[in-house]
């Protein structure tokens, strides 16, 4: 099976799960690379051999979602879900080999991102600004994640708007002004992505409609000009002498 065929199968299953959840009034949206593929259909797809589906959902419908996914042939990891189910759920389908990760209300990785208020803005995926931030918060950003950021940046304009066809700069600005750690990681990654662009063409964004360098500059200027909270200023005095990010823990599945 080719990668393209496998990814199409994953995408179809992801959409079907979202549709079924909607029929039961359960908020479920794709996140990660597959979500970015949905939002950037005119760009070359990210190469992936994974067999996992990543979703975002809400704590209020966690039990109903567990029942729904189980009815579709997936087995819940009962130990994992008992320990971490307030923030993440895991399921696996023994027949297809597919697995499902569901983030509840927030991303908890190098930094914490609360997406609950924006969960249902788009029909199949989490909001593009949240997808962008979920990548920019990675302290050890790799080239695939950088390309995912660029895919979003050449597709969606940055605006002070909740328009579904744009990325809402207000969300970005508020986060950059509230949390110095977030600001430090994001500005570091903006510089890394800009350096990648300077190294040569990025095939991942061939056909993009927006200038990635201009978009990166908008983000950089917004991060620098965001009104800064008292806690931001206090933490900035400590700077990098103290680790400003969390180290994501590896949580085994069974």
Regions of interest found by a model, annotated:
Residues 32:
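Catalytic nucleophile loop
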Residues 1-27, 40-48, 98, 104, ...:
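The feature captures the alpha-helical scaffold/lid subdomain characteristic of nucleotidyltransferase
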Residues 7, 55, 59, 77, ...:
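Short gly/ser-rich anion-binding loops that grip negatively charged ligand groups
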Residues 66, 70-111:
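Conserved catalytic core of two-metal-ion nucleotidyltransferases
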Residues 41-65, 69, 149:
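Catalytic metal-binding acidic patch
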Residues 35-38:
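Short, active-site-adjacent cap segments at secondary-structure transitions
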């Amino acid at each position: 099976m080719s990668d393209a065929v496998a990814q199409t199968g994953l995408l179809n299953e992801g959409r079907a799960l979202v549709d079924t959840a909607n029929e039961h009034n359960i908020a479920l949206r794709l996140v990660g690379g597959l979500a970015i593929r949905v939002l950037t259909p005119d760009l070359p797809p990210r190469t992936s051999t994974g067999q996992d589906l990543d979703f975002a959902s809400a704590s209020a419908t966690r039990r109903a979602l567990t029942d729904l996914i189980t009815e579709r042939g997936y087995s819940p990891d009962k130990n994992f879900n008992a320990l971490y189910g307030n923030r993440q759920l895991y399921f696996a389908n023994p027949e297809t080999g597919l697995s499902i990760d569901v983030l509840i209300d927030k991303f908890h990785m190098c930094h914490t991102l609360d997406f609950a208020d924006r969960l249902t803005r788009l029909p199949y995926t989490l909001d593009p600004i949240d997808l962008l931030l979920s990548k920019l918060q990675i302290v050890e950003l790799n080239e695939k994640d950088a390309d995912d950021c660029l895919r979003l940046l050449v597709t969606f304009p940055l605006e002070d708007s909740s328009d579904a066809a744009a990325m809402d700069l207000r969300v970005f600005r508020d986060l950059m002004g509230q949390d110095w750690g977030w600001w430090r990681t994001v500005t570091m990654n903006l510089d890394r992505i800009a350096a990648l662009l300077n190294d040569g063409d990025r095939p991942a964004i061939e056909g993009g409609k927006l200038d990635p360098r201009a978009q990166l500059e908008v983000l950089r200027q917004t991060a620098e000009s965001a009104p800064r909270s008292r806690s931001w200023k206090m933490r900035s005095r400590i700077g990098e002498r103290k680790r400003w990010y969390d180290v994501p823990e590896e949580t085994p599945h069974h």
